[in-house]
């Protein structure tokens, strides 16, 4: 058993009970599960909490539409969410519901304590409200009159409400973020929170509602219900036994503060601004890290039922199996940029990575062991230089995986594991067991080769457990082997010499035919026929030379020109400026620096398209604020007569920071 490294408390965001979760929602619980499982492998005493967020006006309206009570509605949806989490083989320790009696009681006590402390006061709210997002906005925050977060219409709202004094703790939070560089990850999320919200100044937050009833009542003013975010965020402490009166459980004292809150990038503001400030009000330590993961997109954008592009986890499992789906969502998601899932990509990954690289390796190794030695795997120690190369490569992989997981680079970690399987496949090509089998004098060498393969697969399968736990079990059962600890993976040769593998190897992952899969998907989700356009008459256009004349600006001297500094920049992150129809906010690497630059190119490039591009930047412009966001340079573009923009990019590969002269 690995040594006990102490407690490790991690959470996901609790899922909102407005409907069945799609694969984009499910990605988070699978990601969290892989981290929790790996921390357990390392020897941590992990407590992993997830659950459901069950109050709010949106749920009240949906229950009314369904003709049932809100409690009946959330019971059904919460049960469905838990079913999906269990289907995906996630190893959570607690599934909390915000309708749990102990949670509701503590939320009332927390609200009362904040009120008694003077952090909450009664006032009136007048503004715009987005029901789906459960969020208030001022008129200036709307985009084209609609919600800046989801794009749906907002409705005027005027009501008595309680407010939390956010500004009271703002400076303290800014100082905390500056002195705890790992608190908000990835780095680009921290820059967004600081520049877009904290530095411009915080407004007081509405923390109660009177226009609906489905919520936790404020016990000293029961016509008010507690605003959903104060209710939902406190689950992270109530779920492990926090008590506002000082009678917290041993579990709370053991595990708080949380080591990791894993959440979607769209709710990072609530977790890195509202939540820490609530904790400061309660005199509780802040969580050690909040990681805002990217979205899993379905080909043409973020999944939503209104777009009709939703893929559900249980449908994917029916086609591919649990571990194949886990592998895909973990492998395909970059560290901070959105990933893409399509049926075509799923089939491609299953066939190439799972059926070929992994499945074929295991099957070939077991089959050769049975064919040549009746399943007995014996180390005859007849070695060649290629064996040492294999061993050194394999022994390095667990170290690489640990380093990646420490940084939450899960996609990179699982890629490292599969590099081990690829190296074993290469070893087969290098040693050619089929040729050794034909030479009676090479039988001990053949046995050694097969032993090395089985040993390598055992280490790889044990490393795979955090990501594909059932596949690990299936491989080790066929090899008649025990799972290795991380400490044991520091040695090569622990597989018992003379052990016997199964004589009936099973196929881990069968190859799939893309056409057949797509035909089944079509039956599951028939496409709606789009209206056909009437054929347009062809009009012969006069060809013109592709040039454009612009009005000349006044001449400048060479000395004036030399004052400007132009450099190549690499865009490492990019987000939409939600209050603007035109602006994107990019994090641009220029040499060893990372600068924030706001550009009016949203109509021409998506944030996803921008990431990874090398662009030309004016780097010595005086910083200025655009839409309240600090911009530290200018990205250069060309514009045609129709107003279309094109980024100015280097013709050849150039390093970030290269001077443009």
Give each language-model segment a name.
Residues 289-292, 476-478, 585:
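Beta-strand segments within the central parallel beta-sheet cores of soluble alpha/beta enzyme folds
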Residues 2-50, 102-106, 150, 156-371, ...:
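Structured secondary-structure scaffolds
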Residues 472-560:
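Intrinsic disorder at enzyme termini
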Residues 2-77, 96-111, 116, 133, ...:
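N-terminal catalytic cores of NTP/NDP-binding nucleotidyl/phosphoryl-transfer enzymes
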Residues 536-661:
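Phosphate-backbone binding interfaces of nucleic-acid-interacting proteins
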Residues 122, 345-382, 393-501, 618:
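Helix-rich, typically C-terminal accessory recognition domains appended to large enzymatic cores
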Residues 117-170, 174:
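Cys/His-rich short segments
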């Amino acid at each position: 058993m690995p040594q006990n490294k102490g407690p490790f408390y991690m959470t996901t965001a609790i899922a909102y009970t407005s409907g069945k979760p799609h694969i984009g929602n499910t990605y988070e619980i699978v990601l969290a599960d892989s981290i929790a499982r790996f921390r357990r492998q390392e020897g941590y005493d992990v407590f992993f909490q997830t659950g459901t967020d069950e109050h709010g006006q949106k749920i009240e309206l949906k229950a009314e539409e369904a003709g049932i009570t809100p409690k009946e509605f959330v019971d059904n949806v919460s049960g469905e969410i838990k079913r999906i989490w269990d289907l995906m083989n996630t190893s959570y320790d607690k599934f909390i519901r915000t309708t749990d009696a102990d949670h509701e009681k503590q939320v009332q006590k927390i609200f009362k304590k904040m009120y008694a402390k003077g952090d909450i006061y009664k006032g009136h709210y007048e503004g715009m409200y987005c029901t789906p997002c459960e969020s208030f906005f001022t008129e200036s925050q709307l985009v084209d009159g609609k919600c800046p977060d989801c794009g749906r219409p907002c409705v005027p709202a005027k009501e008595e409400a309680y407010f939390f004094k956010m500004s009271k703790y703002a400076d303290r939070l800014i100082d905390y973020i500056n002195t705890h560089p790992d608190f908000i990850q990835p780095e680009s999320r921290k820059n967004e929170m600081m520049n877009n919200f904290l530095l411009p100044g915080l407004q007081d937050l509405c923390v109660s509602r009177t226009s609906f009833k489905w919520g936790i009542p404020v016990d000293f003013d029961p016509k008010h219900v507690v605003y959903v975010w104060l209710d939902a965020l406190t689950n992270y402490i109530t779920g492990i036994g926090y008590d506002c009166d000082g009678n917290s459980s041993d579990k709370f004292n053991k595990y708080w503060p949380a080591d990791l809150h894993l959440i979607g990038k769209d709710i990072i503001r609530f977790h890195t601004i509202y939540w820490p400030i609530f904790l400061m009000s309660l005199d509780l330590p802040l969580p050690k890290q909040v990681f805002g993961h990217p979205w899993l997109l379905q080909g043409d954008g973020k999944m939503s039922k209104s777009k009709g592009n939703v893929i559900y986890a249980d449908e994917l499992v029916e086609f591919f199996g649990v571990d194949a789906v886990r592998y895909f969502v973990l492998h395909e998601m970059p560290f901070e940029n959105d990933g893409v899932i399509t049926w075509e990509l799923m089939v491609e990954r299953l066939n190439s990575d799972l059926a070929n690289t992994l499945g074929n390796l295991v099957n070939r190794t077991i089959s050769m062991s049975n064919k040549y030695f009746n399943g007995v795997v014996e180390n005859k120690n007849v070695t060649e230089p290629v064996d040492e190369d294999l061993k050194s490569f394999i022994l390095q992989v667990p170290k690489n995986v640990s380093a990646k997981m420490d940084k939450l680079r899960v996609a990179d970690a699982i890629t490292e594991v599969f590099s081990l399987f690829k190296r074993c496949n290469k070893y087969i090509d290098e040693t050619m067991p089929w040729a050794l089998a034909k030479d009676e004098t090479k039988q001990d060498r053949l046995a050694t080769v097969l032993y090395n393969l089985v040993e390598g697969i055992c280490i790889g399968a044990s490393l795979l457990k955090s990501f594909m736990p059932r596949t690990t079990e299936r491989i080790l059962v066929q090899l008649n082997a025990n799972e290795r600890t991380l400490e044991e993976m520091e040695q090569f040769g622990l597989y018992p010499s003379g052990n016997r593998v199964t004589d009936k190897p099973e196929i881990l992952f069968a190859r799939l035919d893309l056409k057949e899969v797509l035909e089944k998907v079509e039956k599951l989700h028939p496409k709606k026929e789009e209206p056909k356009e009437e054929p347009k008459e062809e009009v012969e256009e006069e060809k013109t030379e592709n040039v454009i004349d612009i009005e000349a600006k006044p001449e400048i001297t060479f000395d004036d020109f030399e004052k400007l500094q132009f450099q190549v920049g690499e865009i490492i992150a990019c987000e939409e400026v939600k209050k603007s129809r035109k602006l994107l906010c990019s994090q641009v690497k220029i040499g060893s620096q990372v600068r924030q630059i706001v550009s009016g190119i949203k109509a021409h490039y998506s944030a996803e398209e921008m990431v990874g591009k090398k662009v030309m930047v004016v780097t010595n412009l005086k910083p200025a604020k655009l839409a309240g966001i600090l911009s530290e340079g200018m990205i250069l573009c060309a514009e045609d007569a129709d107003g279309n923009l094109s980024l100015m990019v280097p013709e050849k590969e150039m390093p970030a920071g290269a001077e443009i002269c």
